[in-house]
Design a protein with these regions (language model features):
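Gram-negative bacterial Sec-dependent N-terminal signal peptides
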Residues: 1-19
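N-terminal maturation segment of proteins
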Residues: 19-583
Length: 583
């Protein structure tokens, strides 16, 4: 079991006396984190905190109000701590905490808080995948899981009630993104309960710590719950979605068309980028990056012997040699590339994480409508590895030449390396497990794709075009996301822009544009974060000259976990100064 850093009441909201400002901050941070775990009991279990091991979250709007009210009380406590009495590390901690609390408070002020699902992430999908993050070693582990399954109907009703508020307030997802969403619900209703995703813990080998009789009894109880609680709830959700939600879907793709949408989008831009850049500024940065990358793509096409970028891309999109015939073949290719990457890591990093990662296929019921791949973090506390999920649907649109760039982003040195390393850092639990800034995390993932050049991964024009296509993909996001949500672009305009500029397949572009429409602002973080890391590397190289060490720079970037970009900039400036001082 994981212990929190300091003991204390979960909701100790009263303002403390100031005998020691740094100590007060530690107490506050741990109180905030304990409150967060109470609100996220499944995540708490994944971290080995078992006080709420049989619970699921409260999904009501009243719960959102409660979290915002608690954040305001915590913010009052933070404001009462004299910042000039904090040491340098505590000032960073306080700044990150302040940002998180303000985000909770401000986010709850928008009507868009009732938007509780996207086309690729909803409560039914999250709970169907819940088991992959939980420990299953003891009888108590399985009992807790069964208790959670029994709460499915309550969670379903709460989420439907919130979504009904979204319908009433005209905060629904756009119609153009909802194609096939019914299948993500109906796909979880299985004729054979033993093949249900909710039954997965019992489809695996019985752990030694559970008797055969207990395991059989618990499995039978889970079967009954899936049949009598979960399947009826899924049928209820499917009927509600078809009759109530889908007919009320939004006709405009941009969030700015919703009530208060322009203000909400500005909030989302600040949240995801951790900058003060406006949508217009970001749009222009995107156009500039698209032009630069396009020129590089022309050069690679010429090296490959093609008269134009478009001709080479057409070859890459249509030649059968670049595509797997079976899911197994695709997964084998991914596994081979990741093994090569693993061997290159020691030359680029001084510190490597201990937690391993594995590769799995994206579940079939969500694969058709979701992105190419994603990463699911592991847990050192309960011994669960990180997972790089690969989409094996629509094989004729999953080219081999994308695999190197995709793998360095999702696995190592990208998400797995960064997140698993963060879990080992001597930071507060709040920082290690609760503070994830998209601009840093995804910026690092995209920067890692560029590290593939130094690893020698892009050893053919096809693979290099794959890298450039992925970089172009993220540059296009700056243009497309702001175009849709700030400039009134249609979905087709967004698709046409990405088709004209990237080498992505039609299926990928469709899924990606749906994602940008459904999740305003999130896609902006990747390219802006990567540009900042590259800018800091250039600065450090210039300042340190022959003393610059790339592995040490990478360790410095990752050394304080996920941080806002302004904090990262100061962090690297401090590292450069310290390196200079070594003489």
């Amino acid at each position: 079991m994981r212990k929190l850093l300091l003991a204390g009441s979960i909701l100790a909201l009263a303002v403390p006396a100031h005998a020691d400002a740094n100590g007060d901050l530690v107490t506050l941070v741990n109180d905030v984190w304990a409150a967060s775990l109470k609100e996220q009991p499944v995540y708490a279990s994944a971290l080995g905190v078992n006080e709420h091991a049989s619970e699921l979250s409260d999904y009501t709007l009243a719960a959102q109000d409660r979290r915002a009210a608690d954040a305001a009380k915590f913010l009052t406590r933070l404001n009462a701590i004299p910042s000039d009495s904090l040491n340098a590390a505590s000032k960073v901690e306080a700044g990150i905490l302040r940002r998180a609390l303000n985000s909770t408070i401000e986010g709850n002020s928008f009507g868009q808080r009732a938007i509780n699902f996207t086309t690729y992430s909803s409560w039914h999908q999250q709970l169907a995948g819940m088991a992959q993050n939980l420990p299953f070693r003891t009888k108590a582990d399985f009992e807790s899981y069964n208790a959670r399954l029994a709460q499915y109907a309550r969670v379903n009703d709460e989420n439907i009630a919130v979504a009904n508020v979204a319908i009433k307030g005209k905060y629904t997802q756009p119609c153009v993104t909802l194609k096939g969403f019914e299948g993500t619900i109906s796909g979880l209703i299985t004729t054979d309960v033993n093949k249900s995703r909710f039954y997965e813990p019992y489809a695996k080998k019985r752990p030694a710590g559970v008797s055969e009789a207990d395991f059989a009894g618990l499995a039978k109880a889970a079967e009954a719950t899936i049949r009598t609680v979960i399947h009826p709830a899924l049928n209820k959700q499917l009927a509600w979605y078809t009759a109530s939600y889908k007919p009320a879907c939004a006709t405009a793709p941009g969030v700015s068309a919703q009530p208060g949408g322009a203000k909400y989008y500005a909030f989302r831009v600040r949240e995801e980028t951790t900058t003060s850049l406006t949508a217009e500024q970001i749009h222009q940065i995107g156009l500039n990056e698209v032009a630069r990358i396009r020129a590089e793509m022309v050069e690679v096409a010429s090296q490959a012997g093609y008269p134009s970028r478009e001709a080479f891309i057409q070859h890459l999109r249509t030649d059968p040699q670049y595509y797997a015939k079976t899911p197994e073949e695709l997964m084998e290719k991914v596994a081979r590339v990741t093994k090569i990457i693993d061997g290159k890591m020691p030359s680029l990093f001084g510190r490597l994480p201990r937690l391993p990662y594995g590769i799995k296929e994206i579940p079939a019921e969500t694969a058709e409508g979701t992105t190419t791949a994603y990463y699911n973090q592991g847990s050192p506390e309960i011994g669960i590895s990180g997972t790089y999920f690969v989409n094996t649907s629509k094989l004729n649109q999953r080219p081999f030449w994308e695999i190197p760039a995709l793998s360095v982003h999702e696995g190592v040195p990208g998400h797995h390396h960064q997140i698993a390393l963060q879990q080992e850092l001597p930071l507060s639990d709040f920082r290690k497990y609760g503070a994830f800034f998209t601009a840093f995390t995804e910026g690092w993932g995209l920067y890692s794709e560029r590290l593939g050049i130094e690893m020698g991964l892009y050893d053919t024009p096809a693979k290099d075009m794959g890298r450039l296509s992925y970089e172009m993909w993220r540059a296009c996001r700056l243009v497309v996301d702001t175009g849709i949500h700030a400039k009134g672009w249609s979905k087709q305009q967004a698709i046409d822009f990405m088709t004209d500029n990237s080498a992505l397949s039609a299926a990928n572009i469709e899924a990606e544009v749906n994602r940008y429409i459904s999740w305003p602002g999130q896609a902006l973080a990747y390219k802006l974060g990567e540009l900042k890391i590259r800018e800091l590397r250039t600065m450090a190289t210039k300042e340190l000259g022959p003393k610059f060490n790339l592995a040490a720079f990478h360790d410095a970037v990752l050394g304080q976990g996920s941080v806002p970009l302004d904090v990262l900039e100061q962090q690297i400036k401090d590292w450069v100064a310290a390196e200079k001082a070594k003489g």
